[in-house]
């Protein structure tokens, strides 16, 4: 394993990297991982610092981020505001404080949920959201380290529209494209 300092949005973190940890570019369980060990940064481009040109989506969407880790919330919020500069992004660190009702969640276009949280998990929140017909237009995206085939199948059964693997270090255009696909599917792009 190689330990490399990686500059992140909120400061200097250390990332442990091995070829078996390579992110795949799809939610497919059958993806083949081809590793070229010449450039570690090509495997883990920072979504906030990559040099890839993209056009931000200027629609005033409303997003809810639920994660028990404050640093994850800050990083993901900053990334979303880079991709959607006119969006409203609310963060919640206490999963138990998320009231799941039409009145409280219907104004969100998309909810990003960490899966492993104390008290109330992301899968429990997703199950409750999807059990309410009134919240069908709200998109759900899992953001998690649990990314095995069985996990992805469970998230799909629970009604998640997509899953990002943590750390979220995909190319910016890929993240933007996947979020826009969920927005189009769930709410028809409505603002």
Swiss-Prot record:
Domain of life: Eukaryota
Gene3D superfamilies: 3.40.50.2300
Keywords attached to this entry: Phosphoprotein
GO biological process: filamentous growth of a population of unicellular organisms in response to biotic stimulus; phosphorelay signal transduction system; positive regulation of filamentous growth of a population of unicellular organisms in response to biotic stimulus
PROSITE patterns assigned: RESPONSE_REGULATORY
Annotated CDD domains: REC_hyHK_CKI1_RcsC-like (cd17546)
Entry keyword annotation includes Phosphoprotein: yes
Record-annotated Response regulatory domain positions: 62-181
Modification 4-aspartylphosphate occurs at: 114
Phosphoprotein keyword on record: yes
Function in brief: Required for stress adaptation, morphogenesis and virulence.
Protein name: Stress response regulator protein 1
Organism (species): Clavispora lusitaniae (strain ATCC 42720) (Yeast)
Gene label: SRR1
């Amino acid at each position: 394993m190689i330990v490399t300092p990686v500059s992140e949005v909120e400061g200097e973190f250390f990332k442990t990297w091995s070829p078996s940890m390579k992110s795949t570019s799809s939610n497919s369980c059958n993806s083949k991982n081809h590793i070229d060990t010449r450039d570690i940064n090509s495997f883990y481009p920072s979504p906030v610092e990559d040099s890839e040109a993209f056009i931000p989506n200027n629609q005033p969407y409303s997003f809810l981020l639920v994660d028990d880790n404050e640093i994850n919330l800050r990083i993901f919020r900053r990334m979303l505001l880079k991709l959607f500069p006119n969006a409203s992004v609310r963060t919640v660190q206490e999963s138990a404080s998320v009231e799941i009702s039409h009145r409280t969640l219907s104004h969100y276009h998309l909810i990003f949920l960490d899966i492993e949280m104390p008290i109330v998990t992301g899968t429990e929140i997703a199950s409750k959201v999807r059990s309410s017909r009134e919240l069908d237009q709200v998109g759900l995206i899992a953001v998690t380290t649990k990314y095995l085939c069985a996990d992805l199948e469970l998230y799909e059964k629970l009604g998640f529209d997509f899953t990002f693997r943590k750390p979220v270090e995909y190319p910016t255009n890929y993240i933007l494209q996947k979020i826009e696909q969920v927005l189009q599917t769930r709410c028809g792009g409505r603002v």
